Amino acid sequence: MLLTRKNVAVRPARAARRDVRAMSLLGNLFGGGSKPTSSTSNFHQLSALDIDKKNVDFKSLNNRVVLVVNVASKUGLTAANYKEFATLLGKYPATDLTIVAFPCNQFGGQEPGTNAEIKAFASARGFSGAGALLMDKVDVNGANASPVYNFLKVAAGDTSDIGWNFGKFLVRPDGTVFGRYAPTTGPLSLEKYIVELINSR
């Protein structure tokens, strides 16, 4: 069936899933190369620049659950994910849950903006406050991938490329990786694991 403007508007989730499958296939064919490696043994040993180019030492996130996600502003999955991020941020204090969002422009060029534009976009959708860490734009796959993403893939036991925008990782309060989740997995569907990890401290 041809995707008309009406069809895309009525079924955005279905269209987004097709995008994810298509890009995953392209990634398998043309991306990748060598598998990522990491000498880091714990998420809390890492650091990265935030959206304002300030260094964030992840040991400051000790004893809280961390959801790491690669975000984009112009993706079919954007609206639903940011809405669910806002719901989680409204329910759990930063001392329980922090969402660490890395803008990435590797998938269809869907995060083309400047850091200032990305920050304004995220803030307007409720991604703000102490529990919302918006990071500097990074690559998540390939030779220039962020060391954070190399670590997450290795620690999760799945070194395949991130398939699309909004791939997710859950990190335990002790800095070990709990799980890796597909772009189509909504943030709220992970809430049961988030609560479990909060209560495990």
Swiss-Prot record:
The keyword Plastid does not apply. The keyword Cell cycle does not apply. Pfam families: GSHPx. Residues 1-27 form a transit peptide. It catalyses: 2 glutathione + H2O2 = glutathione disulfide + 2 H2O. Its main location: mitochondrion. InterPro entries: Glutathione_peroxidase, GPX_AS, GPX_CS, Thioredoxin-like_sf. Its EC number is 1.11.1.9. It is an enzyme of class 1 (oxidoreductase). GO terms for cellular component: mitochondrion. Disulfide bonds: none annotated. It comes from the Eukaryota. Belongs to the glutathione peroxidase family. May constitute a glutathione peroxidase-like protective system against oxidative stresses. Hydrogen peroxide, tert-butyl hydroperoxide and cumene, but not phosphatidylcholine hydroperoxide, can act as acceptors. This is Glutathione peroxidase 1, mitochondrial. The gene is GPX.
